[in-house]
From Swiss-Prot:
It comes from the Eukaryota. Starch granule-associated phosphoglucan phosphatase involved in the control of starch accumulation. Acts as a major regulator of the initial steps of starch degradation at the granule surface. Functions during the day by dephosphorylating the night-accumulated phospho-oligosaccharides. Can release phosphate from both the C6 and the C3 positions, but dephosphorylates preferentially the C6 position. It comes from Arabidopsis thaliana. Induction: Expressed with a circadian rhythm showing a peak at the end of the day and then decreasing to reach the lowest levels at the end of the night. GO terms for biological process: starch catabolic process; starch metabolic process. Changing G203D: Nearly abolishes glucan phosphatase activity. Keywords: Carbohydrate metabolism, Chloroplast, Hydrolase, Plastid, Protein phosphatase, Transit peptide. Starch binding efficiency is dependent on pH and redox conditions. Disruption phenotype: Reduced plant size, slightly delayed flowering, leaves with large round starch granules and starch in excess. Changing K237A: Slightly reduces glucan phosphatase activity. This is Phosphoglucan phosphatase DSP4, chloroplastic. GO terms for molecular function: amylopectin binding; carbohydrate phosphatase activity; phosphoprotein phosphatase activity; polysaccharide binding.
């Protein structure tokens, strides 16, 4: 069985033989206190993580660096809140933070120094599963190569990178099958505690952990979500998990969708959203014969929101289906891609698209078979 989505964006640091020398490094000089807001209801979109630190006195140059990190954290938190649709705050300058979701599964923020590897080894972590892309690391100045090199010195821990684009629910959907396949095999191989992280540990990492719990560990989706939210304030994209589940069980079907906008003397028309996320744009082509700007796009099954950008101005097209305004005041167009709803696959998709889908025994077996046969060579 082939993976739905090949995974070239994955790197693995292999475990060494048990005869290698292990080194102990002292912990960071900062004394960190982390306060997390009380657990919230699973359906509360206004999840918030609050961190406080008490550090020893620092030099002026160190304080300058902290100020820059604080500014970057503010910007990142604003972007995250806007993109995720939930009030989320990440303070990179306070160091790595995490929560045990289960005794064998941790969701947390990114490692920042090689010394963080030692901190995780001390709590029994055997697999560090990183979902960050290079731009994520560069933004906060994290040297991933030094962290990977340090982890390779030890026989009892493995560092794995499987990238997912930040703030992109479609990329999450498309990457989940191969990423969770890699995670599944790593857990079987290494045992112990697994540390899943992205940048803040509030979007991609909880989504991957939640999917693993749903597909492999026998949880219903909302049962796993409730447990996750009781341990860590975060905002995983549930629709991406539902769609990735359906993609494996019914096959990844695509259909061509045509979007059109009547020309009114525009110079440039673009679309954002759809399957590319809100941070990217696709230009439309003007058909002078019909007087319409046109975009043809192959999309998998599901509902995709989008917006037009006409000569730099964001708007929606009232001649196409639209929804809103949403809680942020935005009105978006949407394209709904469906196969035959009366078919067996159509019935399965409808059932698993519900608020709290429950996998049948044979469906979970099929998912695990997929994860087992999605070979390392493909990822």
């Amino acid at each position: 069985m082939n993976c739905l989505q090949n995974l070239p964006r994955c790197s693995v640091s292999p475990l060494l033989g048990f005869g290698c020398i292990q080194r102990d490094h002292s912990s960071s000089s900062s004394s960190l206190k982390m306060l997390i807001s009380p657990p919230i209801k699973a359906n509360d979109p206004k999840s918030r993580l609050v961190l406080h630190a008490v550090s020893e006195s620092k030099s002026s140059s160190e304080m300058s660096g902290v100020a820059k990190d604080e500014e970057k954290s503010d910007e990142y938190s604003q972007d995250m809140t806007q993109a995720m649709g939930a009030v989320l705050t990440y303070r990179h300058e306070l160091g790595m933070n995490y929560n045990f979701i289960r005794p064998d599964l941790i969701v947390g923020s990114c490692l920042q120094t090689p010394e963080d590897v030692d901190k995780l080894r001390k709590i029994g972590v055997k697999t560090i599963f990183c979902l960050q892309q290079d731009p994520d690391l560069e933004y906060f100045g994290v040297d991933i190569s030094s962290i990977q090199a340090y982890a390779k010195k030890y026989s009892d821990i493995q560092h794995i990178r499987c990238e997912i684009r930040d703030f992109d629910a479609f990329d999450l959907r498309m990457r989940l099958p191969a990423v969770v396949g890699t995670l599944y095999k790593a857990v079987k191989r290494n045992g112990g505690v697994t540390y899943v992280h992205c940048t803040a540990g509030m979007g991609r990492a909880p989504a991957v952990a939640l999917t693993y719990m749903f597909w492999v560990q026998g949880y219903k989706l909302m049962e796993a979500h409730k447990l996750l939210m009781s341990k860590r304030s975060c905002f995983p994209k549930l629709d991406a998990i539902r769609n990735a589940t359906i993609d494996i069980l019914t096959g990844l079907k695509r259909k061509t969708v045509t979007l059109t906008l009547k020309d009114k003397g525009f110079s440039r028309v673009e679309i954002s959203g759809l399957d590319i996320g809100w941070g990217q744009r696709i230009p439309l082509t003007l058909d002078k014969g019909t007087g319409f700007w046109i975009l043809k796009r192959e999309l998998p099954e599901g509902q995709f929101e989008y917006k037009y950008i006409i000569d730099g101005e964001w708007t929606h097209n009232e001649a196409e289906p639209f929804i809103g305004p949403n809680k942020d005041g935005h009105t978006n167009n949407y394209a709904k891609v469906v196969d035959d709803p009366t078919s067996v696959d159509g019935t399965t998709r409808e059932r698993l698209s519900s608020e709290d889908p429950e996998l049948l025994e044979e469906e979970r077996s099929k998912l695990i078979q997929f994860l087992e046969t999605c070979s390392e060579a493909e990822v």
